[in-house]
Amino acid sequence: MFNDDGKRLISKLTDNMVPYILDTLTTIDGHEVYYDDIKNLAGHITDKILQVGVIDPEELNVLNHSDCWLSNIMFRYDRESGKLLDSYLVDYQICKYGSVAIDLISFLLSSTKLEIKVNKFNYFVKQYYDQLIKHLKLLSYNKKFPSLIDIHKSLFKNGIWGYMAVCDVMAASLLEETESASFDNLFSDSPEADAFRTLLYNGKTYKEHLKIVLPWLHNRGALQKETI
């Protein structure tokens, strides 16, 4: 994803989708708070997202799935009780060594229910952190362990990845059933493609999540054009 082909894909998914996002925002109460931030980001989002892929040797770096959302997880349930027994990640096509923010932000913004997406974000980060430390010890990791604050610093630093998730996996996961859903319609210039993109970013459920997520990203500084 962080090569030339990936750059073109990211641009299509983010910078090119700004007009659709802005049109949708005008229908959401309170959008004035963050509307200009997103408008000013247009043309700069791709480069900011690519910066997330730059490895910082001073931070903890992990092997990310890089497309971590519910559609790429298989679940195994007990046939009688329905109890969840196990889960497996699938589709390892774009794995990336780098910041923990890549998978954490993508998964937590795309695959959680509306009522816990923001309200329980820090809770889930703590659960991740506890499991991380447990397994670093299990694997006899011999470098300095990250603190929970270190993980949060990485999430704040790479907050623009949250906007990537909003345009990409969150939109896909909340898309209402339609026969027009296809990669061609996501990226081509036809009237049918334009209609699909309008549907993708203007769905009722998607807008309910936008109304919660975008102010949250705004308040975290994730939508700032310039880093102070």
Show the residue positions of the predicted features.
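Helical subdomain adjoining the active site within ATP-dependent kinase catalytic cores
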Residues: 144-153, 158-228
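Catalytic activation segment of kinase domains across protein kinase-like and atypical kinase folds
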Residues: 47, 55-62, 69-111
